[in-house]
Regions:
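General structural signal for secondary-structure boundaries
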Residues: 1-4, 26, 92, 101, ...
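Short, conserved loop/helix-junction motifs that constitute active-site signature segments
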Residues: 139-144
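Conserved mid-sequence domains
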Residues: 35, 39-138
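A structural micro-motif
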Residues: 82, 146-147
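Glycine-centered flexibility sites
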Residues: 23, 81, 88, 151-153
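Peripheral docking tails and interdomain loops at the edges
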Residues: 147-184
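Long amphipathic alpha-helical segments
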Residues: 1-48
C-alpha cells in the first residue's frame, strides 16, 4: 500500500498544482482532483493492518499546503504497521505555549515510552519547519533517547534547522524510520 502512496498519490499532487498554475484546470477541477486524492488516502488508511505497539509516529503539517502530503504519509506509515497519530495542519498552533502542549500530548499517547517515537513534520516554509523543530527539540532534550525528529519540506542554507533526518522523499523517510525501529 505504501507504494501506491509514494509512486502514485504523492507525484500527483505537484502535477495538479502545475495544471492549475498553468491555467489548464480551474479552481473547481483542482478541488475535485484534490478531493479524489484525499478520498483515496482515506480508503488506503481504512485497509491498513494492525499496528505494532513499539512503532509510533506523530505526523503534522506546519501549513495548509502540506496537509495532503502529511495525510498520505500517515497512510503509508499505517500500511507498514506503525501506530500513527496524525494531527493535521498545526499552523494555527504556532505560539510560545506549543512545547507545553506537545509535552502533554506525548504524555498521553506515549505513556510507556516503549519502542520508538518519530515526529514527522511537513512544511512548505523554512519558518514552519524551524518553529516545530525547535519546539520538538526542547521536549526531546528532557525525554527518552528513542524520540526522533524528521523534517520534510523546503529547507535552505540560510536557516539552521535541527533534525535527526531531513528528507524530501517519503520513501526515504519510511526506510529510515523502519531501520531506526529495527535497531532499537
Amino acid at each position: 500500500m505504501d507504494k501506491i502512496v509514494t509512486e502514485i498519490i504523492l507525484p500527483t499532487l505537484p502535477q495538479i498544482q502545475k495544471l492549475f498554475d498553468d491555467g489548464k484546470i480551474g479552481k473547481s477541477e483542482q478541488q475535485l482532483m484534490t478531493g479524489i486524492i484525499a478520498n483515496s488516502i482515506l480508503m488506503i488508511t481504512h485497509h491498513s493492518s494492525k499496528s505494532e505497539s513499539g512503532k509510533n509516529v506523530i505526523i503534522l503539517s506546519a501549513d495548509s499546503e502540506s496537509l495532503l502530503i502529511s495525510e498520505a504519509a500517515a497512510s503509508a506509515f499505517r500500511s507498514q504497521n506503525w501506530n500513527v497519530f496524525s494531527i493535521g495542519d498545526m499552523s494555527s498552533a504556532i505560539d510560545v505555549l506549543f512545547d507545553l502542549e506537545l509535552r502533554k500530548l506525548l504524555s498521553k499517547i506515549w505513556k510507556s515510552k516503549e519502542g520508538i517515537m518519530i515526529i514527522l513534520i511537513f512544511s512548505q516554509s523554512e519558518e514552519g519547519l524551524k518553529f516545530f523543530s525547535d519546539s520538538f527539540y526542547s521536549v526531546k532534550e528532557n525525554s527518552e533517547n528513542n524520540m526522533f525528529i524528521v523534517l520534510s519540506g523546503k529547507t535552505g542554507k540560510k536557516v539552521k534547522i535541527k533534525a535527526d533526518l531531513s528528507a524530501p522523499k517519503l520513501e526515504d523517510i519510511l526506510q529510515w524510520s523502519n531501520t531506526k525501529y529495527e535497531n532499537i
